[in-house]
Amino acid sequence: MNRESFLLLLVLLFALPLHLQASSPCNNMADTTCISDSAKMFPPAIGVYHVKPMKNTLRHSLPLVAASLLTFNVDDNIRELRFTGAGSFHTKIDNVSQLVPLMAQLSMRGFGYKGRSKSWGKMLVSDALGMALMGGMVNAGKYSFGRLRPDGTAANSYPSGHTATAFACATLFHLEYGSRSPWYSVAGYTVASFTGISRIVNNRHWASDVLCGAAVGILVGELGYWISDLIFRDPTGYNYKLTKKQEGTLESMVISLSTGNRYINRQMDFEGKTVERTDAFGMNLKTTFNPSFARWVRIGLQFSVSTEKQKGLTRERPAKVFVAPAISLGLSAGVEWHPWQRASVWAEILPSILFRTDFTNAQDKPDEMSSKLHRRSSFQPAFQVGVAYRVSDHMGIEAHAGYQLGEAVYHLMEETSTWSIIKKRATVPYRGFEFAVGLQFYPFR
């Protein structure tokens, strides 16, 4: 199968549910009234309303596909970030974690904890369909694109099979037990996200491979239950959704993952040697919520990691680049405004702590500077403004710009095997602009 055939297969899989939706006799009726006669035979414990087949599935998968295509341009930057912060890290836990959500689903059913499926048979058929579709799509993509893995071991990198498996299992778990408690869904997708991140950290996949794998996993999980609902004619299947919502602060929780560049350019002079700080690529993981007593207030927690580069310049030698991870953790507080139902605009301040780090030679060559460069921990306030658009009930996109305002303390140190001494201390402004785009997730809506 060539690349064009694989893309055609994706288009057909996305278009099939829309075609069936258009032919549905309930398509032109109000969502709250379109309930089949068979549903009346099995009245649910709480109210239900009609959800158009696969509508939200496409809204969940398509943003991830778009993000995967856009991430091709920054795959090298993310890989560089991986080597800066976890160059020697390796784990095999992702071989097990990819199946944890599905094992949880089967175990809970085995212990008699009922989910949305009325029988073991229907649940197992849903699982089998989802996993079979996942295997077919992943292998079709791997052999169609033939993309080389970042470690150079094989040309079957796109999409990530481990990530697709993990998100397919998480989606199957979510569809079976998510209506019982949203925490099951949060747990499943957290494990799936960990699996995807571990594939990047293990240097086995590019970030775009992982995003496409997540899109495939979500799509096939939803397709598995959707097809089994058609086979079993289950009135409590995909077409019906519980109206019970999480009330208060929990419902407003947003988890966002964004990538971008931080433009901080300053120079330091250490004993005739000029050290120039250059642009830093990074990623932000943020959780925010709106308190129930003041929905316009925005409070959160942000974890950021970026690659800080220092270019050492001398008159006699060419520039050498030294790198280190710039890791920060901080709180955020601000205001949020919703000009439209699906759109939001916010402004916030983020007081954070920038953790200390040691710089290493980016070229992996002997250091021509006799001294080592360290950056101390420091307080780093920042300001951000951003916009977001909710694509579906559980996913959205965002873009934000910020300005970092602080100072950083650098030490030029002479080190031996037994002692170290600070030769020079420099306190310089650590200020600059940040621009980033990313995805938002709403686990409790």
Curated annotation (Swiss-Prot):
GO terms for cellular component: membrane; periplasmic space
Gene Ontology biological process terms from the UniProt entry: lipid A biosynthetic process; lipopolysaccharide biosynthetic process
Signal peptide start-end: 1-22
EC id: 3.1.-.-
SMART domains (alphabetical): acidPPc
Cellular location(s): Periplasm
Keywords linked to the UniProt accession: Hydrolase, Lipid A biosynthesis, Lipid biosynthesis, Lipid metabolism, Lipopolysaccharide biosynthesis, Periplasm, Signal, Virulence
SUPFAM superfamilies linked to this entry: Acid phosphatase/Vanadium-dependent haloperoxidase (SSF48317)
Enzyme class per UniProt: hydrolase
This protein's pathway: Bacterial outer membrane biogenesis; LPS lipid A biosynthesis
A single MF term (Gene Ontology): phosphatase activity
Record CDD domains: PAP2_like_5
Result of knocking out the encoding gene: No longer responds to changes in hemin, decreased removal of 1-phosphate from lipid A species. Accumulates bi-phosphorylated pentaacyl and tetraacyl 1-phosphate lipid A species. Lipopolysaccharide (LPS) from this strain is a mild inducer of the human innate immune response via Toll-like receptor 4 (TLR4) in cultured HEK293 cells; double lpxE-lpxF mutants are more potent than either single mutant. No change in resistance to the cationic antimicrobial peptide (CAMP) polymyxin B. Double lpxE-lpxF mutants accumulate multiple mono- and bi-phosphorylated lipid A species.
Function, in words: Removes the 1-phosphate group from lipid A species. Absence of phosphate groups in lipid A renders the bacteria resistant to host-derived cationic antimicrobial peptides (CAMP) and allowing it to camouflage itself from the host innate immune response.
Miscellaneous section: When grown in low hemin conditions the major lipid A species are non-phosphorylated tetraacyl and 4'-phosphate pentaacyl lipid A, while under high hemin conditions the major lipid A species are non-phosphorylated tetraacyl and 1-phosphate tetraacyl lipid A (hemin is protoporphyrin IX containing Fe(3+) with a chloride ligand (CHEBI:50385) involved in the change from healthy to diseased gums).
The protein's name: Lipid A 1-phosphatase
Organism listed in the record: Porphyromonas gingivalis (strain ATCC 33277 / DSM 20709 / CIP 103683 / JCM 12257 / NCTC 11834 / 2561)
